[in-house]
Amino acid sequence: MRVSFVSAFATAAFAACNGHDELCGRKYSNITFIGTHNSAFVGELPFNNQYISVSEQLNFGVRFLQAQTQDKNGDIQMCHTHCWQLNAGPLHNYLAEISGWIGKNPYEFVTILLTNVDALPIEKFDEAFSSAGLKDIVFRPKKRLSRDEWPTLQELLDDGTRVIVFMDYNMDESKVDYILDEFDYFWETPFGETDPSFPTCKVDRPEKGDPTVLMGIMNHMLNHDLLGVVMPDQIQTEKTNSEYSIQKQVDLCESSWGRRPNVVLLDWVNVGEAMDAQISLNGLRGSHS
């Protein structure tokens, strides 16, 4: 099993814009990010999705973090489907870890995608971002942006923006203007794939999502079905996260929609060649070791 902990995205700390000068002049919507699926669920049990902590994911080169939230007695907890199944703690702690990392890395820009299936009040999320010290550095667009209207990374950093926040459901931008509706900006491929060939790049969400106008999220996480229970497949992770496997599905998306996805979500991101793929997909100099 190939496990790597040093990223070309992370080692060039002197370079602006997520470790690469070449990214400074690119629009946010013209970059492909390797992202961590269920980034808060760290461990080796069947319902975990990552081996390394959120800070380690960021050190590794990940700049797109996806995470589930659930309602536990009115509080926002980082729970996997149900809090009795897996509870990684309060949202505040998760955000505080990200905030601490950002404070030590002045030229880095991070995207956070949260779920809110339990329709927790958006004001509670606002409180968590404020208490974690992120509220003053989030992106607040003055209007809904088309794909071509996104600023460059340099423009975002120059404005003091370090974080973009999206939410899948139950956000309210009239109350909290920086938690953006994911599906105003992205479409997603299906998740829960059990075929290691990843044979599809069809639109799963939103129902009428248009890849010709939205940014794309490619779910590249392999699962296995155990007596009707779908769980992350750890055994084939090195193959799933190989540059070949990632590139193959990216090519399928590009041939289907004329554009490569903006985000590739992975489980067990430090296994395989995820960062090599990120370097390659963005046409950047350097290699991952």
Across the structure, where does each feature detected by a protein language model lie?
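Fungal secretory targeting signals
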Residues: 1-16
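Catalytic cores of phosphodiester-bond hydrolases, prominently lipid phosphodiesterases
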Residues: 16-289
